[in-house]
């Protein structure tokens, strides 16, 4: 019950911030071209992108700091990687609180499709399982460092149907593809591999094996979803780069 109240309180704070951002961006969005997608012209769509960027910056910064700390540990510290980490405990609460608020409000405003609903639910479940064990610091860091890619993504999602040919929209798309590959595919896949491969030998004694297997299955499912998206994102970024290269050649001619 205490954990549910904790998540609920953070989700409530994020929900208020989410809605407040929608009101604060009115002067800026009113000067933007309209989106070709009707639901994106709802001011709360822009507010969600601002709130999501704040979450990505806060959670990503904390998680990347934790990853650096793990990377600079002496070799043979696998047991430490499966223990808790104070930074990740706080980042996990921030992250899960936002995911809950974003899921509820996103459904309410009709911003989420089926794939993103599954994505949110998987992340909430994984973080809840990890927090219930009070451990898995490295795993939590690899998961939450993926939020770094949300910074260029949120700008791209805001502008892709408003000014698709603007240089900043294209730059954000390519930057997101690079960040997605680095944090969500490379770092995220390593985190899943590390947990699945080493959990049998380094799982804390007080954690039930069934719970660890459930967490491992959730990680694999989330990772498969990331790779599915990664192929699509990579193709889109390649098209942007080819179009840019073709335009440069045409100007030179």
What do these predicted regions represent?
Residues 144-152:
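Generic alpha-helical transmembrane segments
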Residues 1-145, 157-253:
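Membrane-helix and juxtamembrane interface regions of eukaryotic multi-pass membrane proteins
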């Amino acid at each position: 019950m205490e954990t549910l109240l904790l998540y609920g309180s953070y989700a409530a704070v994020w929900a208020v911030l989410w809605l407040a951002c929608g009101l604060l961006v009115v002067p800026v969005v009113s000067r933007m071209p309209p989106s070709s997608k009707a639901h994106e012209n709802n001011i709360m769509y822009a507010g969600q992108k601002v709130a999501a960027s704040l979450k990505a910056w806060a959670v990503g910064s904390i998680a990347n700091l934790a990853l650096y700390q793990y990377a600079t540990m002496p070799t043979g510290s696998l047991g430490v990687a499966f223990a808790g980490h104070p930074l990740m405990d706080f980042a996990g609460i921030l992250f899960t609180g936002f995911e809950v608020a974003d899921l509820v409000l996103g459904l309410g405003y009709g911003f989420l499709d089926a794939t993103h609903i599954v994505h949110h639910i998987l992340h909430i479940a994984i973080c809840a399982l990890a927090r219930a064990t009070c451990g898995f610091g490295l795993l939590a860091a690899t998961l939450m460092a993926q939020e770094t890619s949300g910074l260029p993504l949120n700008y791209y999602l805001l502008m892709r149907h408003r000014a698709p040919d603007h240089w900043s929209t294209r730059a954000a798309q390519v930057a997101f593809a690079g960040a997605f590959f680095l944090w969500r595919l490379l770092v995220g896949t390593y985190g899943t591999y590390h947990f699945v491969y080493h959990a049998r030998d380094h799982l804390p004694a007080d954690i039930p094996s069934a719970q660890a297997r459930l967490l491992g299955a959730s990680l694999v499912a989330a990772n498969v979803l990331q790779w599915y998206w990664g192929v699509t994102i990579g193709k889109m970024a390649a098209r942007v780069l080819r179009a840019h290269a073709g335009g440069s050649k045409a100007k030179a001619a």
